[in-house]
């Protein structure tokens, strides 16, 4: 447990902190560096050079591409997926027991330092053995149940899944399984045609392997800037934003209801795999 008089320079959210950043987005890296400099819990962070989707073999060529309007969107999704894979591979190769993976456009929520300290203290005391924890999310997928109240009106929840992979912690036990299920550059277009995006795949599959937690409202959000995935400015997801772009806070459904709803949703997504396979085959014929 962190001593009451300790500073955040005495603690870290994970063994390693990795920031995914495209080479042609240095302004994002500069903004992250400015934000992270005074924060000890980001100390020793490392940059992961993101994969630019338009440079992946097969981009812009049949069968997957036929000069469609959304070609660059699909390239962004593929590059994002391979970038997260690259970060997890790095964490595994470093021998870390946990890794905090951040995208370069993150923004800290109000009362971040207080909530981060409380999160570390209470997570250390939590009996649940979790494998992944999302410090921010864009959209909830499935049920959630409250585990621990944190300072500043936040809480830690167990969740089925969520959309949003801009700030999350993975434990070492999940590394190999995730890497075995994420695509390589050679298979990424087939994978994307079926699963669309890494956060969608996480939302539907990660809780099959490990217990998934999330902090809500967001401990870490992200600011609005041009997205290489969406090819437009994204939503501003920070705790101060109470408008329509802010994610709805998670709600406790109770342990029994949580277990039952997770089983039902898992069965539904298992059936959806057939639809995913068919959609992938169709996109190979028509293009992404």
What are the roles of these predicted feature ranges?
Residues 1-102, 106-288:
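An acidic/histidine-cluster motif and surrounding catalytic segment
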